[in-house]
Amino acid sequence: MQQGQKQNIKTDKSYYLTLTIVNWIDVFTRKNHRDAIIESLKYCQKEKGLVIFAYCIMSNHIHMIVNTNEPFLLKDTIRDFKKFTSKKIVEQIQNEPESRREWMLKLFEEEAEPSKRHKYYKFWQEGNHAIELFSENFVWDKINYIHN
């Protein structure tokens, strides 16, 4: 599936998702940015019905196996998660010590320029590379991949 292509996420299924930073920038090498992700995941669990079976925060992307409880929709929960975390982490980069601040903000700004949805900065790549979990073996393959 090409970057930015819409995916049909079904309401009653679990998915293996990969959320990636634009230009594969190593944002999550900083603990405060990883903490922002974890706090937001916890919020989504409590307030948006997110069910997390497995996840791993890599230096420039996140893998997770997730679904949502009714009445919530996974696509909406992930959209809100990405929107909130992009704003939060960009604010952290702007306001907290960060040796790569100017470089990262310039790249985020350049990514936002051709976009109508992103006013100043674009943090996440489009799409979630959603793969429906279709068998027990596939689920265990993905869990082992995430945790190894």
What is each model feature region?
Residues M1-N148:
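Short catalytic/metal-binding and nucleic-acid-binding patches
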